């Protein structure tokens, strides 16, 4: 029996007395809260940084989208212009009148050395 009391005495010596237990728990709790506060602050900073990055990316994409819409509008106008030029040229063109219907690539390649009947500033050197 004395042996068992020694072991129980040694177990009491391993854990701090009740007053010290409370203060060490308090210290751990304060440390854990501080660590958690810092982790939460870092998480909020990362979230803010991510939102800022997404906002800048969104603005950049909006600018690209506006530029592409402007280019589409310009190309559509150019297409209308060239379609109009082609339509006004077809009745005057002897190459088109003499040829049989063929794919557009062939018709346009026949025009490679043909002088355009266009007096537009676009075609002026």
Curated annotation (Swiss-Prot):
Biased composition (Low complexity): 1-14
Pfam families in the cross-refs: bZIP_1
Tissue spec: Expressed at highest levels in lung, and at lower levels in placenta, liver, kidney, spleen, and peripheral blood. Detected in SW480 colorectal cancer cell line and several hematopoietic tumor cell lines, including Raji Burkitt's lymphoma. Strongly expressed in mature B- and T-lymphocytes. Also expressed in moderate levels in lymph node and appendix and at low levels in thymus and bone marrow.
Subcellular location field: Nucleus; Cytoplasm
GO cellular component terms, A-Z: chromatin; cytoplasm; nucleoplasm; nucleus; RNA polymerase II transcription regulator complex
GO molecular function: DNA-binding transcription activator activity, RNA polymerase II-specific; DNA-binding transcription factor activity; DNA-binding transcription factor activity, RNA polymerase II-specific; RNA polymerase II cis-regulatory region sequence-specific DNA binding; sequence-specific DNA binding; sequence-specific double-stranded DNA binding
Post-translational modification: Phosphorylated on serine and threonine residues and at least one tyrosine residue. Phosphorylation at Ser-43 inhibit DNA binding activity and transforms it as a negative regulator of AP-1 mediated transcription.
Region (Basic motif): 28-50
Stimuli inducing this protein: Up-regulated by PDCD1 following infection by HIV-1 virus, leading to inhibit T-cell functions and exhaust T-cells. Up-regulated by Epstein-Barr virus (EBV) protein EBNA2 following infection by EBV.
Domain bZIP: 26-89
InterPro entries in UniProt: AP-1 (IPR000837), bZIP (IPR004827), bZIP_sf (IPR046347)
Spans annotated as Leucine-zipper: 54-75
Residues that bear Phosphothreonine: 48
Coiled-coil residues: none
Function recorded in the entry: AP-1 family transcription factor that controls the differentiation of lineage-specific cells in the immune system: specifically mediates the differentiation of T-helper 17 cells (Th17), follicular T-helper cells (TfH), CD8(+) dendritic cells and class-switch recombination (CSR) in B-cells. Acts via the formation of a heterodimer with JUNB that recognizes and binds DNA sequence 5'-TGA[CG]TCA-3'.
Annotated family: Belongs to the bZIP family.
Subunit structure comment from the entry: Heterodimer; mainly heterodimerizes with JUNB. The BATF-JUNB heterodimer interacts with IRF4 and IRF8. Interacts (via bZIP domain) with IRF4 and IRF8; the interaction is direct. Also forms heterodimers with JUN and JUND. Also interacts with IFI35.
Name of the protein in question: Basic leucine zipper transcriptional factor ATF-like
Annotated organism of origin: Homo sapiens (Human)
Gene that encodes it: BATF
């Amino acid at each position: 029996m004395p042996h068992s009391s020694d072991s129980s005495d040694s177990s009491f010596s391993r854990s701090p007395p009740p007053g010290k237990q409370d203060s060490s728990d308090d210290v751990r709790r304060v440390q854990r809260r501080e660590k958690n506060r810092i982790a939460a602050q870092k998480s909020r900073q990362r979230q803010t940084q991510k939102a800022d990055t997404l906002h800048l990316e969104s603005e950049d994409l909006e600018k690209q989208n506006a530029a592409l819409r402007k280019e589409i509008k310009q190309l559509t106008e150019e297409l209308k212009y060239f379609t109009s030029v082609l339509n006004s040229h077809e009745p005057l063109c002897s190459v088109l009148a003499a040829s049989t219907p063929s794919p557009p690539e062939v018709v346009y390649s026949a025009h490679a050395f043909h002088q355009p009947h266009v007096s537009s500033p676009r075609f002026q050197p």
